[in-house]
Amino acid sequence: MEVLFEAKVGDITLKLAQGDITQYPAKAIVNAANKRLEHGGGVAYAIAKACAGDAGLYTEISKKAMREQFGRDYIDHGEVVVTPAMNLEERGIKYVFHTVGPICSGMWSEELKEKLYKAFLGPLEKAEEMGVESIAFPAVSAGIYGCDLEKVVETFLEAVKNFKGSAVKEVALVIYDRKSAEVALKVFERSL
């Protein structure tokens, strides 16, 4: 895990890190989930496997939590399902916050941006509500959902800048691969 950038945004310490989000020392990590919380690939699969040792089992746990927390089998943009981090608790990670970003398929619009903004803001608000002081995000929707990484990072930064809260002290964006992390770093440097 390498921290590439750190800055203060109000009372929040904002970081950009390159590495595996399941290794990041935050109280909550965010999962870029699909609306039915089926953790079949990408960061969702990696987080599910790290938490429960088996992605299928963690999918079942997540779906049960979604039914308990929302009374239905899907979540919308901005809604957050909270599950225990299980095996990751030994690393100090207590919760996984499941959020749903938009499917861009290479396109971008105000509507897609609004959905993505909600996907970033929702977990920040949930962290505030639960008194969680540190939270790490992946680049929601930048993988298989095909949103432009620069737009994703810009939207993430906008959500953090606009977030109003006092409990959350540290927010990180964790990017797995070096090339993408360098793209994100350029956005951080010109935005902060």
Swiss-Prot record:
Reaction catalysed by this enzyme: 5-O-(ADP-D-ribosyl)-L-glutamyl-[protein] + H2O = L-glutamyl-[protein] + ADP-D-ribose + H(+); 4-O-(ADP-D-ribosyl)-L-aspartyl-[protein] + H2O = L-aspartyl-[protein] + ADP-D-ribose + H(+); alpha-NAD(+) + H2O = ADP-D-ribose + nicotinamide + H(+)
Disulfide bonds: none
SUPFAM superfamilies: Macro domain-like
Keywords assigned by UniProt, alphabetized: Hydrolase
Record EC number: 3.2.2.-
GO biological process, one term: peptidyl-glutamate ADP-deribosylation
Keyword Hydrolase: yes
Annotated binding of substrate, by residue: 19-21, 32-34, 39-44, 140-146
Pfam families: Macro
Domain of life: Archaea
Macro domain segment(s): 1-192
Effect listed in the UniProt record for changing residue 42 to D: Abolishes hydrolase activity
Name of this protein: ADP-ribose glycohydrolase AF_1521
Record organism: Archaeoglobus fulgidus (strain ATCC 49558 / DSM 4304 / JCM 9628 / NBRC 100126 / VC-16)
